[in-house]
Design a protein with these regions (language model features):
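Membrane-proximal intracellular helices of multi-pass ion channels
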Residues: 1-370
Length: 370
């Protein structure tokens, strides 16, 4: 095991995190909030990151180093990412801060907080920005910004990415990372502007776009998206939750003009079919609960998109929905988004693959029985 190279890569990733902490620091300064929690966090994270990145090492890097680096980096990223929460004084203990940080970077969206609106804007910004960093993968961001492992970066990408198959979009892995994050940034900015046009303030548009892009679900409001009471905002976020649930390699194909090849994706067709069919079933099931103005369809589509993408936003209290709709949402939670997206769960591609393998297995067993 090449520990020196792993520690060096860890140090560079912590330097990226220290740089990312500058953004919420600017938010604090803009809104005239106390910047000390972020100043201390930047100093501590940067110092440890610099010390580790200066370690001398050889270039021997194999898959086992990739998996170990991913595990160590996610642990340390979460530990240092919790520092602003701890120094802010709004969390009772560092354990709670660490929980919030892990939830942010892993885009889980669970929180120890019962009310988020009293928190400073800088802290709320950092909570959602952790979603954005963790959604595509912190290490993929590091590779894009600081390519230093040459062709061996593919080991890191494979260890970092949760989908069944990880391949390079172009021959150079670092270039693939830049393409992925370029698409990621472009889609995020597009959502920011769409939400702003729909009437959401700039700050809220940024925070909710980060959470949508990372499919995490942290919000600036206690009632999540339901607090805005805006059909336009709900429709926009519904669309972007689905957009970020699709394999980013397909967007690359679209950019290359290979539209037919992108649309021939079996996983994409299965994903869209599941979304459409689930929305239809839930809409019919909850139709009597809402006015006859299409609200049932809007809320059904929003919650289907929120659950299957594992984002976790809410436009209404779906605990009040009939049991059939709630069970269907739970099933969607297990299916999840497409491979190569920022969404979670077992990935949509595995469902038809498992089904085909099961059919083949049963067919072979029946032949053996005959």
């Amino acid at each position: 095991m090449n520990f020196r190279l792993v520690f060096k890569l860890t140090g560079k990733t912590l330097l990226v995190e220290a740089g990312a902490l500058l953004l919420p620091l600017l938010v604090c300064l803009f809104y005239r909030e106390n910047p000390l929690p972020f100043l201390l966090s930047i100093a501590m994270t940067g110092a440890v990151g610099l010390a580790l990145s200066l370690i001398r090492s050889n270039d021997h890097f194999f898959p086992r180093e990739g998996f170990f680096a991913v595990a160590l980096i996610w642990l340390l990223m979460s530990a240092f990412g919790a520092l602003p929460f701890f120094f802010s004084g709004f969390f009772p203990s560092y354990v709670d801060c660490f929980f919030e940080s892990v939830s942010g970077f892993t885009t889980t969206g669970a929180s120890v907080l019962t009310a988020v609106e009293p928190l400073p804007r800088g802290i709320l910004f950092w909570r959602s920005f952790m979603h954005w960093m963790g959604g595509m993968g912190v290490l993929i961001l590091t590779i894009a910004l600081l390519p230093s492992l040459g062709g061996r970066t593919l080991h890191v990408m494979r260890a970092e990415s949760p989908g069944p198959i990880v391949s390079k979009l172009v021959p150079k892995t670092s270039q693939s990372s830049k393409i992925l994050y370029g698409i990621y940034c472009a889609l995020t900015l597009l959502e920011v502007f769409c939400l702003r046009i729909a009437g959401m303030p700039w700050y809220d548009s940024l925070v909710h776009s980060f959470a949508t892009a990372g499919t995490g679900g942290f919000s600036t409001r206690n009632l999540s998206i339901a607090a805005y009471e805006s059909p336009a905002i709900e429709v926009i976020i519904t669309l972007f939750m689905l957009v970020f649930s699709i394999n980013f390699a397909l967007y690359f194909l679209l950019l290359c003009g290979k539209v037919r090849q992108a649309l021939r994706s079996d996983e994409l067709r299965f994903f869209l079919a599941v979304v459409a069919f689930s929305t239809l079933l839930i809409s019919i099931n909850i139709w009597p609960m809402y006015p006859a103005d299409g609200s049932a369809v809007r809320h059904a589509a929003f919650q289907v998109g929120s659950i299957i993408s594992t984002t976790g936003f809410a436009s209404t209290d779906f605990n009040l929905w009939p049991e059939f709709s709630r069970i269907l949402l739970v099933l969607l939670m297990f299916i999840g988004a497409c491979a190569g997206s920022t969404g979670g769960a077992i990935k949509c591609s595995r469902v038809p693959q498992s089904g085909r393998r099961l059919v083949v297995h049963l067919r072979d067993d029946s032949r053996d029985g005959v």
